[in-house]
Amino acid sequence: MDKRTDDAVRETKLKARPELKGDEGWTRLGYANNFDLSYQHIKDTLPRIHCKSISHDEFIARYEKPRIPVILTGCTDSWLANQKWKLSSLAKKYRNQKFKVGEDNDGFSVKMKMKYYIEYLKHQKDDSPLYIFDGSYGEHPKKRKLLDDYHPPSFFQDDLFKYAGEKRRPPYRWIVIGPARSGTGIHIDPLGTSAWNALISGHKRWMMFPTETPKHLLEVSKQDGQHQSGEGIQWFVKVYPKVKSPTWPKEYAPLEIIQHPGETVFVPGGWWHVVLNLDQTVAVTQNFSSPTNFHVVWHKTVRGRPKLSQKWLRALKIYRPEIARIAAEVDLLRQSGLASDSSSDSSSSSSSSSSEESNSESEESTADSIPEQSESKRRKVDAVE
């Protein structure tokens, strides 16, 4: 890297991860040399279906309503992003635009110019590298052009949170760009929302666990993880061997996935997941509330974001009265049935934005009943993969 890029990277790292204390802290574990990124030996356990081979109603009945993860193929075939989101093209078109790669200790975004980030991505040897996880591109006058390059798959277009308004709704869409070893720590997506993640280039390794899996089984302890306990790669180093051991409880058996370019992962609300990039990756991901999962999302939003829920309900009464009637029928005194991560129900996670997310209902009472947070503090945990 040239001096200007090197200076930009050092400044960004100091803001985003001051606890790592310089270059040695970022490479101390030597994962660039000793972590196996090959995936040919991994048994992928998630089925694939072509998006044109199933109707919307069938998708709801087979996957969304029973909350079963699945990989969709063919959904991105017509996207302009397939051509426009090559790293060289992004580096040229958005070279001087700043994208979020983390947060500082006060919860404010740490950003980096695309031209510097792409150079960093190509040359870095960090254990858990900086990761573009930008959720504000849609509101930026120049970066918003990225919205023209893709559209949500048809199964996910009826997003009820849109009625809360773009400025009021929780962060919900992210462009994610990262090198090998970057990723997201173990988490549950915010407010009971489901998510889709479409991969443009590269390969991602996922592990997913059912909602009832106890959080303490999935966490990397601070003692084990040290300064990297919230990072995806550290999870695979410390927890993955336990998951694959004969003593792992069968009732918490995981799903293991290798996501390839052109594949879209559907993550139902409540599923724990951790993601590791195996090479240079570019993806887009969105969280959503649909008529199918609305009863859970409403329950968690009322308890976790009461002011937002009031504004949302007023809009639903006008534009979607049939959904507003469902809201009136939700018993807020009963538990929702989906686990919550203590930091996630005002949000979720990335290696560049600390795990925005125990066991099912015991933790829900704390996560879903947190009061309205200040916007600056919410930003720190409002990112997901």
UniProtKB/Swiss-Prot annotation:
Keywords (A to Z) from UniProt: Chromatin regulator, Dioxygenase, Iron, Metal-binding, Nucleus, Oxidoreductase, Transcription, Transcription regulation
GO molecular function terms attached to this record: histone H4R3 demethylase activity; metal ion binding; P-TEFb complex binding; peptidyl-lysine 5-dioxygenase activity
Name the record gives this protein: Bifunctional arginine demethylase and lysyl-hydroxylase PSR
Ligand binding (2-oxoglutarate): 197, 285
Lineage top rank: taxon: Eukaryota
EC number: 1.14.11.-
SUPFAM superfamilies listed in its UniProt record: Clavaminate synthase-like
Cell location: Nucleus
GO cellular component term of the entry, any: cytoplasm
Gene3D superfamilies per record: 1.20.1280.270, Cupin (2.60.120.650)
Keyword field contains Transcription regulation: yes
Source organism of the structure: Hydra vulgaris (Hydra)
Names of required cofactors: Fe(2+)
